[in-house]
Amino acid sequence: MNFWDQRFSESGFKYGTEPNAFLRMEAGRLSAASRVLVPGDGEGRNGVWLAGQGHAVTSVDNSSVGLQKAQTLAAEKGVTLTTTLVDLADWSPAPASVDAVVLIYVHLPGSFRLRAHRALAAGLKPGGWLILEAFHPLQLQHASGGPKDVDMLYTPEQLTEELAGLLQPAQAWQGETNLSEGPGHQGLAHVTRWLGQRI
């Protein structure tokens, strides 16, 4: 059982069942019935919400426990969600296969982050959107969630550089926000929000 299987084996939903606030704000950019990929969707709160908005959603994660809970949540909400067990260290979507990629608090180590981010961006069709929210390095000053390894925290500038040539930035912001996302994300946080459109 891996780290995330253990975490998601706890009762309830670690990050709640409601979608991320930034995703909710920006999802209007998506065309009706978009094909959406949600890597690192865990227990499914974001993928299930997107499916409820009428999109065709595939949630991928390396936790079978999380994906089982995602399917349970989808059934409770009366929506269809495709789930696939993958490891982002060596997995890539088919090129130009989806209309949007949603990365919400998916913190990858530097050893494969660049490869994974560029592979996910390449999975977007021309004009497709990447919607990303993650903890910024200044999150280390807060106790509201996230990894304690600065190598796994993202700045807007870093993302813009990593995705150059694939995505045109539409928003690259960092600052403080109050999180209320289940017991796992609570309180004042310093986050990075990044939006990009496939070139």
Indicate residue ranges for each PLM-predicted region.
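Conserved class I S-adenosyl-L-methionine
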Residues: M1-S31, L138
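A short glycine-rich, Lys/Arg-flanked "PGG" loop and its adjoining helix->strand segment in the class I
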Residues: L114-P126
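Conserved beta-strand signature within the Rossmann-like core of class I S-adenosyl-L-methionine
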Residues: G127-F135
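Short alpha-helix
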Residues: D151-W173
